[in-house]
Amino acid sequence: IKKEKIWDFTADLRRTAGKEVPIFTKGEKYDVLVVADEKGEFGEYLSYRTWDPRPIAGTQGLKPTSWHRTHEQWGATQMQNRFRRESGRWMTEVDYHAWTAVRSIGEAITRTNSNDISKIKEYLFGEKFGLGAYKGVKVSFRSWNGQLRQPILLAAPRSMVSVSPQEGYIHPVSELDTMGKDQPESTCKF
C-alpha cells in the first residue's frame, strides 16, 4: 500500500464522477486502486474515471473471492451445473464454504473410519488431509489457526481473471501459505 485516502466528498457522483474522481486519484503512482466501499457510496463510480488508467480491485472492480459463478477450471463447471440444477441458482461463496465444510468432515470420517471428534479434528488439521475442491490443488487446514488454505479467485463481475497464489511465490510448507499472515506473523491461535 503506497497511500490510503479517505473519500469524504458529499457530491452526487451520478452527475460529477467524471470531474471528482480524476482529481482524487491524480498525483499518486499506483499499479492498482484498491477500494473499500461496503456501503456502495462511491466505489461504482471509480472504474474508467481515474487519472491514470489502472485496474480497480476490492469491493468494486476485481474481487478476491473463494468462489465465483464464472469459475470453470478443474471440474468447477460440473460442480456449478450440478448445484444450479438442484437449487435453480448460481453457487455463491457461502454455498461453496458449506460444501467444503461438509465434504471435509465427511472425508475425515471416511479416512479415520471413526466418528470420534478428537480423531476427526486431528486428521483435519494434520498433514495427511487434503480435499479436492475444484481449485487445481488440494485444500487443507492450517494446524495453528484452523484457517482453510485454498486458492483465491480474482474475478470481475462477469468473468474470471486469475487464480492466486500467483506464479513465483514460494513457501517452505505450502504455496497457499503465501497469502495472508503466516504462522510467525499471526497472533491468531485456534
Give the role of each language-model region.
Residues 1-190:
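Extracytosolic ligand-binding ectodomains
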